[in-house]
Design a protein with these regions (language model features):
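Conserved class I S-adenosyl-L-methionine
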Residues: 1-46, 60-64
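Class I SAM-dependent methyltransferase SAM/SAH-binding core
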Residues: 52, 59-108
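A short acidic, Gly/Pro-enriched loop at the edge of an enzyme's catalytic core
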Residues: 111-120
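Residues lining the SAM
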Residues: 122-126, 154
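A short glycine-rich, Lys/Arg-flanked "PGG" loop and its adjoining helix->strand segment in the class I
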Residues: 135-147
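Conserved beta-strand signature within the Rossmann-like core of class I S-adenosyl-L-methionine
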Residues: 148-155
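C-terminal alpha-helical "lid/dimerization" subdomain adjacent to the S-adenosyl-L-methionine
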Residues: 156-223
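Core SAM-dependent methyltransferase catalytic element
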Residues: 228-250
Length: 250
């Protein structure tokens, strides 16, 4: 991501949030399918369950989940007030089944929830943490999850060599170009994506906000944190959906 997208502390800014609100539907590969995959993975939870969404954005994923599971409640956490306002408006029809809270993903205060958490989900957020921060996050999430709880992550992943990075960069360009044409009939969104340096695999800077980790490393960290049933459910253009459970479900 280009430098102007960050604030002075190299954090996600409200300007970045507005860009993502306007262009996120083009930039995320198979966005609609990803949401269905994540929602489907929650089907093993029966009865009333409480879900925690780390970096909920505008709440599109949460809408899919709340529609699919009428007995679920969901708390959306995000670092952007603009995102939280949008989510609260977008999900107002669910009443008190959806609540929102401003937070810092890397902080510890939110990791001591007052109510039982049956699932933690996160889309396009964990890559903002360093490797050690991801490991701590996985350990803390394992602790707060109820027995048989599940952690589901959809995120950007790093590649171990230049060949993998190049393939992911080209694939992501192709995905965004195709979505731009499919949704709008032109390549304007793709041109913005390219001009503003949103292809992380072409413009990744070690000092940038984006710190993706290899998928294999993250799967190992999940097991080391105590999770079982660690699995990968989807991959495309440097993006993946993977999950882990607090205990095995037959």
């Amino acid at each position: 991501m280009t430098e102007q997208k960050l604030n002075d502390e190299n954090h996600w800014s409200e300007e970045t949030s507005l860009d993502f609100i306007n262009y996120g539907r083009y930039f995320i590969p198979e966005r609609e399918y990803q949401m269905q995959v994540i929602s489907g993975l929650l089907s093993t939870l029966k009865g009333e369950n409480h879900i925690l969404d780390l970096c909920c954005g505008e709440g599109f994923l949460d809408e899919v989940i709340l529609d699919a599971y009428p007995s679920f409640t969901l708390q959306g956490l995000d670092g952007s007030m603009e995102m939280l306002h949008r989510a609260q408006e977008h999900l107002s029809r669910f009443g008190n089944r959806f609540t929102s809270t401003k937070f810092d993903l890397a902080a510890n205060d939110w990791r001591h929830p007052e109510q039982t958490v049956n699932a933690v989900i996160s889309s396009m957020a964990i890559h903002h943490l360093t490797g050690s921060q991801k490991q701590k996050l996985f350990t803390d999430v394992f602790k707060i999850l109820a027995p048989d709880g599940i952690l589901i992550i959809a995120d950007i992943i790093a590649h171990p060599d230049k060949m993998g990075e190049q393939q992911a960069a080209e694939a992501l360009d192709d995905v965004v170009r195709r979505r731009s044409i499919k949704l709008d009939g032109n390549t304007a969104a793709f041109e913005f994506f390219r001009k503003e340096g949103w292809n992380i695999f072409r413009y990744l800077d070690p000092e940038d906000i984006d710190k993706p980790s290899p998928l294999f490393n993250q799967l190992k960290w999940l097991e080391q944190s105590g999770f079982s049933n660690v699995d990968v459910h989807w991959m495309l253009a440097g993006h993946a959906i993977f999950s882990a459970r607090k205990s095995e479900i037959p």
